[in-house]
From Swiss-Prot:
Protein name listed in UniProt: DNA-directed RNA polymerase subunit beta'
Domain of life the protein comes from: Bacteria
Gene Ontology BP annotations: DNA-templated transcription
Role, per record: DNA-dependent RNA polymerase catalyzes the transcription of DNA into RNA using the four ribonucleoside triphosphates as substrates.
NCBIfam families with a match to the protein in the record: rpoC_TIGR
Length: 1433
């Protein structure tokens, strides 16, 4: 490919296979043997003949000139010089001609015996240590035993190891003629050492036989270890057998007889001044190999003693090892400066390796970079390009035009004119630029909006001008950012840039479908200022207040004549939508500024009559884009950009110290807080409260004081100048600043965190707050305290960026081959979507979650029976409104999680493309978009786990359940007892743990809502009662969990001893004594309460968890419904919550949390077993009698009680549930939804909106594989990981086939063969005719498998494409596996195609478009006419 530079000769290959190279194939590629270790002559600087840079082997150093100089110039092209043997050709052949070294003895390839899994070792069934003994010439190995016996006189077996002594003794004992026998004679004794012995052994392996033997072993082996050993070996054997289907791939090729020498230009030797040379490390490594090989040759010729030869062979093996992979060896070859040499493997690996440096990222021509400045007068699709830069970029186009116009004759003179910058050049450049956009890119390109196309405009100066609204997408600012410019050259590229990438088309953010080109900073401030309303007060009069105008034109005249103020409230006749939704003229109360703003708004959007903030602007732009078109929206954006800047300037909205108003109540509030703190410290000193409580209370006081002060300050600043205070306007409009920052300017800086020592303690809040604010100034101590936070913030940001970048890289890698490939995969599955709630508060409504998805079933309004949406129909905004209005709790929609497309994903399962708000098209690379959408906001996530101190992070607990809809209550599984109510009367107390309340619609009987009724709650309604919306159904104690007596009787304590298993604590508010269960030293003692019946028999026992408060005394008589125990709920556990980036990584990598919960796998009743080794045993028994036992650490809180009924998937102890458990118990669907929701939660806390779709695409990729449980008659192995599609395909192939059990007298059939029933019948009928024994067969057993959840790194490394996996991580391992199994890469993903230099199979590069012929309508008509003419004949 490299040699033929004509366009036509680029082979369009569509797959690449990899395999082991045979010595013959290496020789076939090679141009000659390198015999000498010399490189170039230090005096003449010419390559030495037969050396590592030899011209005869690799080609001439100068273009068309042989080494001795006999033939020069191009006319001798292709002649081989008779004197020096060099072919006369161009020098670039030295980049692709390969040489070789013939090794005197074979050498094992380090990849196949040093890396795990050890390929050669597994084939021979040898451990790595023993294999090393063979390869490094320490032991002889018996290849063929013959008649030899060992010292004990027992016959030797194949693969026995012998020391040299033993070997010589055996040779002495054997008869003389043994060595004259032929090698194939079974009586001959053969034993060898080193790689030459391995070649012999590997050649003798019959893979099919070995495979059969190992399969038998794996199926029938009793010992676990031997079984896994057999399966591991099987994997290597099967890989080699698989490879032989596509190409020849013999195991003995893992041993090398010939070493290839890579082209000299790829390992250059550069002369430096002063007669020294800089060389590539590879040359040193090759030299060592050649020197040792030549020395060994000489020693063998002079018949040196065996010991010396053996040492030399070992050294040769080591030198070849370090050539291929220098890092694997314990003693790597080092340079003089003690740096390990870079071997061939190192040049592939890592960021600087071949894959990532040269194949995935290349440097390109026709590019420029410069600093960016703002271009406020540009249109949405324009950018300013410096003249000189443009002249250089568009040079070839200008040259062409210069020659066409006849201004110059040659290219050379054209270049001169351009370099002189003659006026005619600018004239031509203006023309060339028309319709030829450029691409602008700002690093880091975190999502696809980091590269956009603009139409260039020539400007003076040297900086690129960028449109201010494009900044958000590029994440650019003008503090010295640089951007790169690229020039699309071909007509297709230009078209794509104009139609797909033009900045004015990229208004929406692909992550969530909301506009991204939203005015920010000055623009928002100007628009906010112009639409704000000001009333006349006694201090200032507003000119023209209350006037009425006929039209906007009239108003503009009045405003220009200074007859009316910008912020004056006026009336105007204008068009807007009435109740019926028609555009009509009406009189509106509004302000002058709003009328001016509405002049820019397209008429279809109605009249916008509100104060504009950043938030409202985003909604307005989204609305306008929906109602009108992209060009109109981009025009509107340009208009409001101008308005915003103009009025920000006219308003003079800067601020001074005077605008920062400190509330005069500040001092008194601080004094009051100090008094309270003193009171608390007094309480502490008197011993009424613990140190921890004191700390929490102090922090709470300061937190609330700070909050109160902030509110006051905000109020003052809001009331100042009618809200026209500059600082307040900046904050309120969302242009700049936050409430926090205003608080630090006007209130007090507040509490600061302690510096955190390395992970041990610290990180808490210092209880003395900073009382000053920035206007007053900080004292030296206060300043010192606050520096810590500032520095930590900067350090964190730097670390975070790298982490987020790496996460994005892994995400892209796992999902890069998800492309929309088909219209409909035809699946019948989907996911059920409900509104997202937190503490009964709706975080994300049902409508938001299903918008733009495809409905799985028909949706009908349960109350009116109205048909809302059909199966496979898109849920649009209108349909969402209907669904929200109806009492529908959940909707089933199609989802990427359940898509069954073989390759990529289908349109119906993906739904709407968020970047266009239309249904996605085939060819869209949704995987990469998903990865970018998740990775891009990664830098905004917090890096650390965050700490919730005291009540600062507390939300008041909810304590009641209210009916959400009116209807009929239906309660399942309810058990109640009469008990005491908190207010003293009696009440119904719930004692069942799984009571469920359903509210049904009176007329239709459709279930409207479904809730769990908590244990211990007081219930106010009966089954079947009619409830009103908002009626309280049950209440409970929000601070304590309780255990309630179900029986009347007498209390008996067991193992409840003061000072051992419980302590007496005094409640500081009431002074009452309470018994609190504590952890006892003696782990055997389990504190238990028994309830005794009439005859002192135990009716019921309750285990008491640590921290429980006893509410009854020993021997006390109790009635039913008595509260026996209160367990304080840990309100806002002050532990650290893993949040932010680490949590996202943990979920995507499917790691198990450090303290996992124990989860029940079945529905059943709980009972407690014994304590074993510090673990409490919990037994769950199902109704069918199935029993599962679980061990829970004693330190973990147990969440269930004796005799509780638990459902599968319920946690038995506290901690987070592992994804593995969810998968095993609730199945793949549940775990996928769990992962999506958990990751969303992290982003939601940071206020980042990302559509669920993107997470679903990635999570789907994590569940591509299944693990084979029982291979049946398939080719799979037990425990093997295979793709779901392959698994289904293999099973379908076998469907209905038969397996021969006994071949009878048939010659065609073998036992174990799989054939169709028809073939079996035919064969048997032949046998029947000949009166022979018939063949018997059984039905095929198909394979069974379990779904597997893989982390994104694992999933990327196991993609089908080895090129993609190798360029990701663990390059050598991936290539090593791929070569052994002779893998074929079908180039289906994006990455593989970038690497081999093809167009990516997405978008316009989809393979189905390749065969399309583009022509004009006339040509088509002519073709049809010709065709018809032919038909008539």
């Amino acid at each position: 490919m490299a040699r033929n530079n004509d366009k036509n000769t680029v082979q369009r290959f569509n797959q690449i296979s990899i395999g082991l190279a045979s010595p013959e194939s290496i020789l076939a590629e090679s141009r000659g043997e390198v015999l000498k270790p010399e490189t170039i002559n230090y005096r003449t600087h010419k390559p030495e003949r037969d050396g590592l840079f030899c011209e005869r082997i690799f080609g001439p150093v100068k273009d068309y000139e042989c080494a001795c100089g006999k033939y020069k110039r191009i006319r001798y092209k292709g002649i081989v010089c008779d004197r020096c043997g060099v072919e006369v050709t161009e020098k670039k052949v030295r980049r692709d001609r390969v040489g070789h070294i013939n090794l005197v003895v074979p050498v094992a390839h380090i990849w196949y015996f040093r890396s795990l899994p050890n390929k050669i070792g597994y084939l021979l069934g040898l451990p790595s240590k023993k294999l090393d003994m063979i390869i490094y010439y320490e032991r002889y190995v018996v290849i063929q035993a013959g008649n030899a016996k060992n010292e004990e006189g027992e016959p030797l077996k194949k693969m026995d190891f012998l020391t040299e002594e033993e070997y010589l003794n055996i040779l002495d004992e054997l008869p003389q003629e043994n060595q004259y026998l032929d090698d194939s004679d079974p009586n001959k004794f053969i034993a060898k050492m080193g790689a030459e012995c391995l070649i012999e052994i590997l050649k003798r392996i019959d893979l099919d036989e070995l495979s059969y033997e190992l399969r038998h072993k794996a199926n029938n082996e009793t010992s676990k270890q031997r079984k896994t050993e057999a399966l591991k070996r099987l994997q290597v054997v099967e890989a080699l057998r698989d490879a032989n289907k596509n190409r020849e791939n013999n195991p003995e090729w893992m041993i090398m007889k010939v070493v290839p020498v890579i082209p000299p230009e790829l390992r250059p030797l550069v002369p430096l001044d002063g007669g020294r040379f800089a060389t590539s490390d590879l040359n040193d490594l090759y030299r060592r190999v050649i020197i040792r090989n030549n020395r060994l040759k000489r020693l063998m010729e002079i018949k040196a003693p065996e010991v010396i030869l053996r040492n030399e062979k070992r050294m040769l093996q080591e030198s070849v090892d370090s050539l291929f992979d220098n890092t694997r060896k314990s003693s790597a070859v080092k340079t003089d400066s003690n740096r390990p040499l870079k071997s061939l493997s190192d040049s592939l690996k890592g960021k600087q390796g071949r894959f990532r440096q040269n194949l995935l990222g290349k440097r390109v021509d026709y590019s420029a970079r410069s600093v960016i400045v703002v271009g406020p007068e540009l249109k949405m699709f324009e950018c300013g390009l410096p003249k000189n830069m443009a002249a250089e970029l568009y040079k070839p186009f200008i040259i062409r035009k210069l020659i066409e116009r006849g201004i110059v004759k040659t290219v050379k003179s054209a270049k001169k004119i351009i370099d002189k910058k003659e006026p005619v050049v600018w004239d031509i450049l203006e023309n060339v630029l028309k319709g030829h956009p450029v691409l602008l890119n700002r690093a880091p390109t975190l999502h696809r909006l980091g590269i956009q196309a603009f139409q260039p405009k020539l400007i003076e100066g040297k900086a690129i001008q960028l449109h201010p609204l494009a900044c958000t997408a590029f994440n650019a600012d003008f503090d010295g950012d640089q951007m790169a410019v690229h020039l699309p050259l071909g007509p297709e590229a230009i078209l794509e840039a104009q139609l797909l990438m033009l900045a004015s088309h990229n208004i929406l953010n692909p992550a969530n479908g909301s506009p991204i080109t939203v005015p920010s900073q000055d623009m928002v401030l100007g628009l906010y200022y112009m639409t704000k309303h000001k009333k006349t007060t006694k201090d200032e009069t507003v000119i023209g207040e209350g006037l009425t105008f006929y039209s906007a034109e009239e108003l503009v005249i009045a405003y220009n004549q200074k007859r009316v103020d910008l912020n004056a409230g006026i009336k105007i006749r204008t068009k807007d939508y009435n109740e019926e939704g028609e555009l009509v003229y009406m009189i509106k109360d509004t302000t002058v500024g709003r009328v001016l703003f509405n002049e820019a708004v397209p008429e279809k959007a109605g009249y916008i009559n509100e104060v504009l903030t950043k938030k409202s602007l985003r909604e307005i732009i989204g609305k306008i884009l929906k109602i009108t078109s992209v060009p109109e929206t981009s025009e509107f954006l340009d208009e409001i950009k101008g308005l915003g800047y103009g009025f920000a300037f006219r308003g003079g909205l800067s601020f001074s110290l005077g605008d920062i108003i400190i509330p005069e109540e500040k001092q008194s509030m601080i004094d009051e807080a100090n008094e309270q703190v003193e009171g608390i410290i007094g309480n502490y000193n008197m011993g009424l409260i613990t140190n921890n409580e004191r700390y929490n209370q102090v922090i709470d006081i300061w937190t609330s004081t700070n909050a109160g002060l902030t509110d006051l300050a905000m109020k003052r600043i809001r009331e100042d100048k009618q809200g026209f205070n500059s600082v307040y306007m900046m904050l309120d409009s969302g242009a700049r600043g936050s409430k926090e920052q205003i608080r630090q300017l006007t209130g007090m800086r507040g509490l600061m965190a302690k510096p955190k020592k390395s992970n041990s303690g610290g990180g808490e809040i210092i209880e003395n707050p900073i009382l000053s604010n920035f206007k007053e100034g900080l004292s030296i101590l206060e300043y010192f305290i606050s520096t810590h936070g500032a520095r930590k913030g900067l350090a964190d940001t730097a670390l975070k960026t790298a982490d987020a970048g790496y996460l994005t890289r892994r995400l892209v890698d796992v999902s890069q081959d998800v492309i929309v490939n088909e219209d409909d995969c035809g699946t019948l599955r989907g996911v059920e979507v409900k509104p997202l709630k937190k503490n009964e508060e709706i975080v994300e409504s049902l409508g938001e979650r299903i918008l733009g998805r495809i409905s799985l079933n028909d949706v009908v309004n349960p109350s009116t029976q109205e048909h809302i949406v059909a199966t496979n129909e898109e849920i649009t905004e209108e349909i969402v409104a209907k669904i929200e209005a109806a009492p529908i709790e959940s909707v089933e929609v199609r989802s990427p999680l359940t898509c069954e497309a073989k390759k990529g994903i289908c349109i119906k399962c993906y739904g709407r493309n968020l970047a266009t708000n239309k249904i996605v098209q085939t060819g869209e690379a949704v995987g990469v978009v998903a990865a970018q959408s998740i990775g891009e906001p990664g830098t905004q996530l917090t890096l650390r786990t965050f700490h919730v101190g005291g009540i600062a992070g507390n939300i008041s607990e909810d304590n009641k359940l209210e009916a959400k809809f009116a209807g009929v209550a239906e309660i399942e599984d309810l058990k109640v007892v009469k008990g005491e109510a908190p207010d003293g009367g009696t009440a119904d107390i719930v004692i069942s743990r799984t009571a469920e309340l359903k509210i049904k619609d009176k007329k239709t009987g459709v279930v409207l809502s479904n809730n769990n009724i908590p244990y211990g709650s007081q219930i106010n309604i009966n089954d079947g009662a009619t409830v009103k919306e908002g009626e309280v159904i049950c209440t409970w104690d929000p601070y304590n969990g309780v255990i309630i007596s179900e029986f009347a009787g007498k209390i008996k304590y067991e193992n409840v001893e003061q000072g051992v298993t419980y302590q007496v604590e005094i409640d500081e508010q009431t002074g009452f004594q309470e018994k609190v269960i504590s952890e006892s030293r003696n782990k055997k003692l389990i504190p238990t309460l028994h309830i005794l019946g009439k005859k002192d028999e135990v009716i019921r026992s309750y285990n008491l968890p640590v921290g429980a408060h006893l509410m009854v005394d020993n021997e006390e008589k109790i009635g039913v419904g008595k509260i026996l125990v209160k367990i304080p709920r840990k309100s806002s556990k002050a532990g650290d919550i893993t949040g932010g980036l680490p949590r996202v990584t943990e979920l995507f990598e499917a790691r198990n949390p450090s303290n996992p919960a124990v989860v029940s796998e079945i529905d059943g009743v709980v009972s407690f077993g014994k304590i074993k080794r510090g673990n409490r045993e919990i037994i769950v028994e199902s109704k069918l009698g199935e029993v599962k036992k679980y061990l829970v650490k004693l330190s973990n809180q147990i969440l269930v009680q004796e005799n509780d009924y638990v459902r599968a998937g319920m946690p038995l102890s506290d901690g987070s549930i592992t994804p593995e458990d969810i998968l095993n118990i609730k199945g793949p669907n549940a775990v996928q939804q769990y992962l999506v929701n958990e990751v969303q939660e992290v982003y939601r806390l940071q206020g980042v909106k990302i559509n669920d779709k993107h997470f679903e695409v990635v999570v789907r990729q994590m569940m591509r594989k299944v693990r084979i449980v029982d291979p049946g008659d398939t080719i799979f192995l037990e425990n093997q990981l295979v793709h779901k599609a392959d698994f289904i395909e293999e099973n379908n192939k076998l469907f209905g086939m038969k397996v021969i059990e006994d071949a009878g007298d048939s010659e065609k059939l073998k036992a174990g063969q799989i054939i169709t029933p028809r073939d079996l019948r035919d064969e048997n009928s032949i046998l029947r005719r000949e009166d022979k024994n018939l063949a018997t067969a059984r039905d095929v057993i198909t394979a069974t498998a379990n779904p597997v959840l893989q982390g994104i790194t694992r999933a990327s490394l196991q993609t089908k494409s080895f090129i993609s996996a190798a360029s990701f991580q663990e390059t050598t391992k991936v290539l090593n596996e791929a070569a052994v199994s002779g893998k074929i890469d079908y180039l289906e993903g994006l990455k593989e195609n970038v690497i081999v230099g093809h167009r990516i199979p997405a978008g316009t590069g989809m393979r189905k478009y390749d065969s399309i012929i583009v022509g004009s309508k006339e040509e088509f008509d002519q073709m049809l006419e010709k065709k018809q003419e032919v038909n008539y004949n």
